Amino acid sequence: MEEERNSDEKENALCGRSLTAASRDGGGRMPAAPLAQGKVERGKVYSGDGVLGYLEMLEAQAHELGLKQEEKEQQEKKLDRLKARVQELRARRDELRAKVELQEKRLLDKEGVMTDPAQPSAQTVLEWKVKSLKAMLQVFYLTGISGKLTKQGVCFCISTAYEGTYLDSYYVDLLIKPLVKIQRHSVPVFIPLEQIAKKYLQTDIRRFLSVLSDHLNAYVGRRRQADQLEEHFSDHIDGTLQRNSLCNLLVFNYTVSSNSKTFPFNVRLLYGDLCCSLPTEAIISCTPGTLPLLAEMAAAHSNAFRHMALHKAFDSLINAKESQN
């Protein structure tokens, strides 16, 4: 019994040494699987501060950048769609203008060959005028001119503005049968409406409205500038600003200080172009016999008044004067 037990112990010892040897590689090293498993386990324990945490941060940043890139691409696509829509509207506008011009030409040609009084030429002309006016209303919608058809013609509304500020609206009620003529209007008497109508109303209504709109917008622009000057710079002006109804002639006085002396200047602004809100001539005079520097200053002021809005030009002159003082 004792011999059998000793034999079993020797056999088990030999098996243990064989397993130990088999578990080692050729250099006597233990396999890497348990060590690798230990690293993974340690990585799981310290993932918040280790490599996995860094990878999670990179993944979050990549996701955020992806969202921003997607948003940018969507904005670019939206901008491209808006640009395409603008081009489409412009093309539609040009198409309507071309149709109106073609209809006008056809009507003139048709009236030239009509000799039979039995033909319903008056009705044909009236129908054409109504169609032309409808197309014209669509063309003018984005230019500050709107209108609506009436039983006898069309009533136009011309809206005016200056520097993005809406000011006044004026109305022109036109009759289109048998000839185009003005029935009623709210245009100021000093606007040359009769001359404009005589020149364009019978041959080109679109041109008539465009020129009239230019006159009205230029007038309210000049008036707005004069109002701004009186409102914001009254303490720099001597006396009152003088102007006529059309505001195409403005006269006022202001003073300039130099070397403890005060020199008065007189300004006379003439607006030769009634379709423009800037003067064509700016005459500035100062006391005779004053310093040559004042003459140079007057020339600089004249140039500013001719190239800038009145209140903006005066503001720049006042600021320049205060800087010099």
Swiss-Prot record:
<keyword id="KW-0175">Coiled coil</keyword>
<feature type="region of interest" description="Disordered">
    <location>
        <begin position="1"/>
        <end position="35"/>
    </location>
</feature>
<dbReference type="GO" id="GO:0034508">
    <property type="term" value="P:centromere complex assembly"/>
</dbReference>
<keyword id="KW-0539">Nucleus</keyword>
<dbReference type="InterPro" id="IPR018464">
    <property type="entry name" value="CENP-O"/>
</dbReference>
<comment type="similarity">
    <text>Belongs to the CENP-O/MCM21 family.</text>
</comment>
<keyword id="KW-0137">Centromere</keyword>
<protein>
    <recommendedName>
        <fullName>Centromere protein O</fullName>
    </recommendedName>
</protein>
<dbReference type="GO" id="GO:0031511">
    <property type="term" value="C:Mis6-Sim4 complex"/>
</dbReference>
<dbReference type="Pfam" id="PF09496">
    <property type="entry name" value="CENP-O"/>
</dbReference>
<keyword id="KW-0158">Chromosome</keyword>
<dbReference type="GO" id="GO:0005634">
    <property type="term" value="C:nucleus"/>
</dbReference>
<comment type="subunit">
    <text>Component of the CENPA-HI complex, at least composed of CENPH, CENPI, CENPK, CENPL, CENPM, CENPO and CENPP. Component of a discrete complex composed of at least CENPO, CENPP, CENPQ, CENPR and CENPU.</text>
</comment>
<comment type="function">
    <text>Component of the CENPA-HI complex, a centromeric complex involved in assembly of kinetochore proteins, mitotic progression and chromosome segregation. Involved in kinetochore assembly and required for recovery from spindle damage.</text>
</comment>
<feature type="coiled-coil region">
    <location>
        <begin position="55"/>
        <end position="112"/>
    </location>
</feature>
